[in-house]
Amino acid sequence: MVLSPQNPLKSGDHMLDFETRAGWIETCIQDNPRLKLCTVEKDFPLPSYTHRTLEHLGNLFPDRSFVLLLGEDQLIQFTRWKNYELILNSWPLWVYPRHFDGPSPEKPVPHRLVDAPKIEISSTLIRRRLAQGLSIRYLVPDILWKTCANHPFWRG
């Protein structure tokens, strides 16, 4: 799981600091040996671009192969990503299914749809509920829900 300090297609104005987000991810995945947080982008110049990260990881771990996994809702803007053609030609693109009724991608994007249950919970939903002062209990692991809700960032 690669944590990005700043998505080039989004404003960083309303974003928690990198360390807080990293800590929350570590808390959530601590009991799963198959998941690991990667903070390599923290030291990259901003904005960080996916193709640079994948190239860097390939150089660090030449005996490993990597795929890019993103949510189906993100596929519509994939052709806006910097060097998206390089990504498509160099790494497999896997897409996690979402209940998504938005527009189709502007250009066809070859990808593999992961065979997984559709989960209606998204980071966008969680951020929206926190910003509105609504509970996120049962949407995130128990170990995290109170910490998130009580964080000064969400209490204004």
Regions found by a protein language model. Give the residues of each.
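Nucleotidyltransferase catalytic core that binds NTPs
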Residues: M1-G156
